Amino acid sequence: MTLYIRRESSKLWKRFCSEISTEIGLLAENWKYLLAGLICQYIHGLAAKGVHYIHRPGPTLQDLGFFLLPELGQERSYISETVFTSVFLSFFLWTFHPFILKTKKIYTVLIWCRVLAFLVACQFLRVITFYSTQLPGPNYHCREGSKVSRLPWPKSALEVLEINPHGVMYGCGDLIFSSHMIFTLVFVRTYQKYGTKRFIKLFGWLTAIVQSLLIIASRKHYSVDVVVAWYTVNLVVFCLDKKLPELPDRTAVLLPVISKDRTKEENHKLLNGNGVDPADWRPRAQVNGKIDSNGVHTDNTMNGA
């Protein structure tokens, strides 16, 4: 048992080191895209904070989702955040599975370049929409009478550039469309294309639907915020996926051609005339019952022979 553990540990360590060297090479080539994506995440956070300064609380708008779904209440608002955190962490860990598992289909650096491109495009559209029209927030801390429904004006430029972690849960004004649904749908669609487990793919879409209902039931967004996110994110990912270069497929490395299959392939080529040198098909002349490979007629009586 100890010998088996040592052998497997050695294999795992070699696999990890090999993957590290591969990913470092990819990181050296693509670090600019990753850095740009992270900077855009920061800018998106600043934009969401900025709209909180100009948010004006008011009566909650009439909403079909609020009418159909019972309100969870402020004490149960953590449920949707728990589901989102589970989705985020699960996807994050999955992108690093090539470092551990033997079967792998993606490169970690390349998959995150692709994911960040999807996120940035969707967030750019989101910033445009929630700055175009500010709706009164339906969340409990955004309603009339709440002390945090509107941020006090900043006293310095440094305060504007600071990102408050609590703004993720206690922001107001950044409604159309839901940022949580952007991340959730991008992650689910990415695994749908590059994942290998069908059960997890189905479970991912089911989780996205449940997440949508929980967001509305928690009164964190209007129904329109969730609906717009569903078709906008899917359309953006669909269009960008056609434009971005496809990731190299790693599964071919795990499927070497065995000798039996190679023999069948060679026989198939021979039957179709593809496995023979084209030079062997050129016309040849017959000389005294013999074939001259150069196609030139030779006479054995020439030169008195």
UniProtKB/Swiss-Prot annotation:
One of its GO terms (biological process) is defense response. It is a multi-pass membrane protein. Its EC number is 2.7.1.227. The active site is at H180, H221, D225. Its main location: Golgi. Pfam families: PAP2_C. Disruption phenotype: Constitutive RPW8-mediated HR-like cell death characterized by salicylic acid (SA) accumulation, enhanced transcription of RPW8 and RPW8-dependent spontaneous HR-like cell death (SHL) in leaf tissues. Reduced plant stature. Sphingolipid (e.g. ceramides and hydroxyceramides) accumulation associated with a reduced inositol-phosphorylceramide synthase (IPCS) activity. It catalyses: an N-(2R-hydroxy-very-long-chain fatty acyl)-(R)-4-hydroxysphingoid base + a 1,2-diacyl-sn-glycero-3-phospho-(1D-myo-inositol) = a 1D-myo-inositol-1-phospho-N-[(R)-2-hydroxy-very-long-chain fatty acyl]-(R)-4-hydroxysphingoid base + a 1,2-diacyl-sn-glycerol. The keyword DNA-binding does not apply. One of its GO terms (cellular component) is trans-Golgi network. Expressed in leaves, roots, stems, flowers and siliques. The chain crosses the membrane at residues 34-54, 81-101, 105-125, 168-188, 198-218, 221-241. The lineage of its organism: Eukaryota, Viridiplantae, Streptophyta, Embryophyta, Tracheophyta. Catalyzes the transfer of the phosphorylinositol group from phosphatidylinositol (PI) to phytoceramide, an essential step in sphingolipid biosynthesis. May play an important role in modulating plant programmed cell death (PCD) associated with defense (e.g. toward Golovinomyces cichoracearum) by promoting sphingolipid metabolism and thus regulating ceramide accumulation. It comes from Arabidopsis thaliana (Mouse-ear cress). This is Phosphatidylinositol:ceramide inositolphosphotransferase 2. Pathway: Sphingolipid metabolism. It is found in: Golgi apparatus, trans-Golgi network membrane. Disulfide bonds: none annotated. It comes from the Eukaryota. Keywords: Golgi apparatus, Lipid biosynthesis, Lipid metabolism, Membrane, Plant defense, Sphingolipid metabolism, Transferase, Transmembrane, Transmembrane helix. Belongs to the sphingomyelin synthase family. One of its GO terms (molecular function) is phosphotransferase activity, for other substituted phosphate groups. Induction: By powdery mildew (e.g. Golovinomyces cichoracearum and Pseudomonas syringae) inoculation.
